[in-house]
Amino acid sequence: MIDALRLMAWLSPTYPVGAFAYSHGLEWAVECGDVRDAATLADWLSDVLERGAGRNDMILCACAHRAVAARDDADLVAINDLALALAPSRELHLETSQQGRSFLDATLQAWPCPALAEVAARLEGRLAYPIAVGAAAGAHGVAREATVAAYGLAFVQNLVSAALRVAPVGQSAGTAVLASLTPRVAALAETLHAADRDALGSATLRLDLGSFRHETQYSRIFRS
């Protein structure tokens, strides 16, 4: 029970990581017309979750958890470097690195433990968000599959929240989209919690290009 509550707290909208400031390119997708209602939002989120950063982040989270559990500092540093390198644009790099550092700092202060202190000492500088979450969960002994599932659901929730602010999608429709994607998150977590870095890969080229376009978008409220 305590592990589930810990994950809920760490990945809640109130956790001080600044998730509200990022849309992962969704703001540009709305601007260019790719996302214009609940149906197109669901399609866009499904692609990101199953073929883009959602899937990759869940794998990276699992890898970080595994490295901490094995006390493999070199692998932990290497997987963080890889996670940062996979960010396709400056804004998406900022999105993951700012949230990652904020998450680890907040968790180390509020939920300190010797293993997490060791992790923090190894991961100085830029830190990818899924690495921070996986490493913290591994340090606290939280189950890997539950961690990956919770991370994946929070990823989708944050983007649905962003959509409510920039897309013609109401709260009821947004909640329905989230509900429709929850079984996919669970299915992915069941598989990806055991995956390694060889399973990484994405096919969301339009989103990646959109994240570049967002840097010069005329009117915007998000940092990505």
Curated annotation (Swiss-Prot):
The keyword Cytoplasm applies. The keyword Iron-sulfur does not apply. It is found in: Cytoplasm. Keywords: Chaperone, Cytoplasm, Nickel insertion. It comes from the Bacteria. One of its GO terms (molecular function) is nickel cation binding. Gene3D superfamilies: Urease accessory protein UreF (1.10.4190.10). UreD, UreF and UreG form a complex that acts as a GTP-hydrolysis-dependent molecular chaperone, activating the urease apoprotein by helping to assemble the nickel containing metallocenter of UreC. The UreE protein probably delivers the nickel. Required for maturation of urease via the functional incorporation of the urease nickel metallocenter. This is Urease accessory protein UreF.
